[in-house]
Amino acid sequence: MNDGGLSELLKLAGRRAVPDEHHMARARAAAHGEWKRLVRGRRRRRLLWVPAIAAAVATAVLAPAWFSSHPAQSAGHAQAVAMADIEVATLQMVTGAITVTPRNAEATRLTSAGRRLSTGDRVETAADSRAMFVLSGGTIVKVDRNTHVSLGRGVLTLDRGALYLDAGPQANDRDVVVQTPLARVSHLGTQFEVRLDGLAVRVLIREGQVEMDAGGGKKWKAVAGEAMRLTADLRPERDQIATYGPEWSWVAELPRPFTLEGSTLRAFLDWVSREQGWRWEYNDQSMRALFDIVQRGPIEGLTAKQALGMVLDANDLSFRETEGRLVIVRGR
């Protein structure tokens, strides 16, 4: 909608009408009469209800008068409110400098997190910057370099670059989709990357299942460990990929927030494994109780892999990683 259309909606909404003196007098008289009746009864008990009764009487008297005299303004106001932009995400991390441009406002250059993002906002990263935001329902969105993405209600429109979505068990907005020039990408409780590659769109699935819908009944699905590339002629190309390693290195540089203080070692290792695409395990059953030990100290500012060595060392443990398996062992 252009600025003119929005202005017309706001004009329709108008100011809230002020009730005339006649209706105000009726409301005051009704409330006062009710108050006197209550005083004659059991004073202590019933006086507690006077404010509520007075408010109810005033509403009953004034509301019909207002709505009957302003039907068009009521409808206009409701329509304007319904179309207003709403907050849908919070910026969690920024590396370098990014640009956020609201629908009807000037662009803002940001170098730190904390900004609330609304529908209509456009986020742009440069050649030396990345970002991460969390949607209101809990889904994590990581934004790679040289990316342009616009936020909507349940949809992220990708015009350039790449996004990584992590809709883990904590998320209740798993119906969020990524709209690209060629297809709409939806998922079922998963971790995946969507990247615009020239005139094609490429999807990498780390966990769960993803569907690409090009419209007209043309749909394709892929599961964890698969890559799918859709070209302009709508012919998908498939390949097998690893769910860990260099292909996902940029994702690991934007770690999902985790508070170590008060968490168990088990919860920490679950977080590390999810961020890195690993599966963690241990071979010595006598170590089992160690993973329930509550941890202390901050790890903010560290990637999952950086924090791993520090935390395990503090617990007299170490690890080895091979082919996506993170094996925890005793000793440093």
Which residues are covered by each model-predicted region?
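Short, Lys/Arg-rich N-terminal segment immediately upstream of the first membrane anchor
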Residues: 38-45
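Short, polar/charged, low-complexity connector loops/linkers at domain or secondary-structure junctions
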Residues: 99-113, 169-181, 185-186, 193-271
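Short, exposed beta-strand/loop patches in secreted or surface proteins that constitute
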Residues: 114-116, 149, 318-320
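Single-pass transmembrane signal-anchor helices and their membrane-water interface zones
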Residues: 22-35, 47-80
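N-terminal export/assembly leaders
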Residues: 98-108, 195, 235-332
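Glycine- and acidic-residue-biased ligand/ion/polar-headgroup-sensing regions
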Residues: 73-105, 119-121, 126-130, 145-147, ...
